[in-house]
Amino acid sequence: APPHSYLAPYLYMQKGFKADALIHFGTHGNLEYTPGKNVGLSQADWSEALVGNLPHFYFYTTGNVGEGIIAKRRTHAVLVTHLTPPYAESGMRQRYNQLLEDIHKLLDEGTEGHRMLGMRVKKETVRLGLHRDLELDSVPDNPYTAEELERLDAFTEEIANEKMLGAYYTMGEPYSERDLLQTTLAVSADALAYETAKADRDKGKITTEQLQDFTYIAHHYLPTVKKRLTTMLQNPPRDTAAITPDLRPALRYREQLIASTANEFNAMVRGLNGGTVLPAPGGDPVLNPNVLPTGRNMYSVNAETTPNPRAWEDGKRLAEATLKQYTGKHGEYPRKVSYTFWAGEFITTEGATLAQVFWMLGVEPVRDGQGRVVDLRLVPSEELGRPRINVVVQVSGQLRDIAGSRLKLLTDAVRLASEAKDEAYPNYVASGTVLQEKLLVEKGTSPKRAREMSVMRVFGPVNSGYSTGIMGYTEHSGSWEDEKEIAQGYLNNMGAAYGDEDNWGEVQKDLFASALSETDVVIQPRQSN
């Protein structure tokens, strides 16, 4: 339970000061994480008791929808969103310009007859330390191959176009003209570059493969698009009708960024006056410009519709990219992939994280007439064209609370993949399930129960908690002697199994340890700017 020094201010606000409303400034506090039920709280739960009957308003960054929803659900907070810090160019483009030009010349004209240029590229690559990130050799008299140059080109373009945050956002202070320009470019340039390239693809000027190649887009479209946008944004015309339709969204984003600062305070005052704080989706403005303007009441996603059709395609693509990278490096498919899922990415991608796991397993969603994902279908082995990959999924407490039905769906997916019989390729899910069952029986679990538990692959915080408990070990490093103690603490705190309705949240530490064993790939999808 919270100490009396924590309880006293909240109780004084209610009983002594007799406040009309409560305002928190995030992100984030700890009131929403005090002990008690995850959902359906009562006065016997600390979060509910400490807020009482006070209207609760919470200034919250629009970029952290995952944790914001916890405050909305456990403290009935009205989340008044505020802007994220402004964006800035990383300044890396100029540093890599010459290297990129040399790489493109080699790729366009071939490495034959350009040995000296190839040597120069390698020397510069080694000087910049890029070879270490890509695990390329640094032998000075051995130029890179065309395949290695393509990898180097993609990696360098990614760094050169990297976005980064500038100074902290100060509420009440509009972005400077420079910050406004850079943030508007960050929100709009990539989308416009791809739209321009898509139009060229439809006209037959480029191929679909080129359209899907980030390096190609970054080199052939992004510089021109940024130049067009910068010219328009630095001198916006008074008559918007004079602006070509493809540039109008960027001007709208600029106006929404300007309006956000005043809108944030106006929304708070409107709420305190008993008015409505209008709703809006939450998320990062770069990923979802619809969060603009800020100063609105942030909401989540309908978990039952996830993964939505776009997220399904994104998840498949990401899963295939993972497998391609692994097979390219190791010459074989991974047998088991471990995922760590947080609520924020689940919400902002509308389920692309789930889609990755489904596609690894070789199953796909089945939707009802309202777009809800209500069932799963096994993708035939011949259609999948590869082994079914075993998985283990670790989830945050926030994701467990907002998407419990999806965790059950993940377990159903594992069960479906485990029972697949049409195997033209190995089924690592089935072999993993058999091994799980065997290990459980050896530890004394009844054969019937071991069979039921063998398909469990989803684990999260125990006792309705929200923490791995690792922070405590970090803060009290003198209290442990061996790193194995930290690993054991992690298993103790994250070993609750989710996905089985009859045994929801049951602590299965041994099962969790077994599920984590022999993992080939570890992934935590993150995309916040």
Where do the protein language model's features map onto the residues?
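Ligand/cofactor-recognition surfaces for anionic moieties
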Residues: 1-529
